Design a protein with these regions (language model features):
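Short beta-alpha connecting loops at secondary-structure transitions
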Residues: 15, 118-119, 174-182, 197-206
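Active-site cofactor/substrate anionic-group-binding motifs, chiefly glycine-
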Residues: 13-23
Length: 235
């Protein structure tokens, strides 16, 4: 399962940061920390839903209680690692003022990266970019953390939303080879890499060896038994 995968990846590669994903639950964080025991560079990625829909129907909770749980999870993860990422699940449908409160609280608790997921793939690019910009302008201490994009492709907007996030201040993007992911998939690594390479005016260097994109795409497709559509962009 995921636990053994993280262990084996940690043993096999030493240069990248290896990140283990958890819910904002102490026992989950304990397991994530154990899975990272062989990693040279460790990160725990914990989080909780922040939209009113998630708060009411998934957690039967309140906005204030969600902030408390978020802060507690980050502080608990910091017992194990210095590098802690927090995700605000369904941030795409979370009201901006409340989202800013959550982000500010988890940064104060020690989060080094804050992930702003468009969990349902609902946002338009202008809307998602404006959300990132709002956080950049309204969160005290935003300079102490990196904002990350995490976009789903349910409406075919994942790559556009990710680029919009970058243009408005995000400095980490969560992407997948060939855009693989649940439902309609996640943001395509190869699309973002080539957009940033071709549009020099954005002035962001990913340090990706783009000559390796095509063979990597084919390898992932073969290993996962997921054919790439013939007219897929880039690959």
């Amino acid at each position: 399962g995921d636990f053994n995968s993280v262990i084996e990846i940690s043993k096999a590669v030493t240069w990248p940061t290896i990140c283990a994903l958890t819910r904002a639950v102490q026992k989950d964080i304990d397991v994530a920390a154990d899975a990272l025991k062989f990693a040279k560079h460790k990160r725990i990625h914990t989080g909780i839903g922040t939209s009113d829909s998630h708060i009411k129907y998934k957690f039967n909770s309140t906005r204030e209680e969600i902030i408390e749980r978020a802060v507690a999870a980050v502080k608990y993860a910091k017992r194990y690692v210095e590098d802690v990422e927090f995700y605000a699940e369904d941030a795409g449908r979370t009201e901006n003022e409340y989202l800013a409160r959550v982000v500010e609280a988890v940064i104060k608790a020690g989060a080094t990266v804050v992930n702003i997921p468009d969990t349902t793939g609902y946002c338009l690019p202008e809307e998602y970019g404006a959300k990132i910009r709002y956080l950049m302008e309204h969160v005290d201490g935003i300079d102490k953390a990196i904002l990350s994009t995490h976009c789903h492709n349910d409406l075919g907007m994942a790559t556009a939303n990710t680029i919009s996030g970058v243009l408005n201040g995000a400095r980490q993007v969560e992407v997948t080879m060939n855009g693989i992911g649940e439902r309609a998939g996640n943001t395509s690594l190869e699309e973002v890499a080539m957009i940033l390479r071709c549009h020099k005016d954005i002035d962001i260097d990913t340090n990706i060896n783009t000559q390796k994109i095509y063979p990597t795409s084919r390898m992932v497709s073969s290993l996962m038994n997921m054919p790439v559509q013939p007219n897929k962009a880039i690959v």
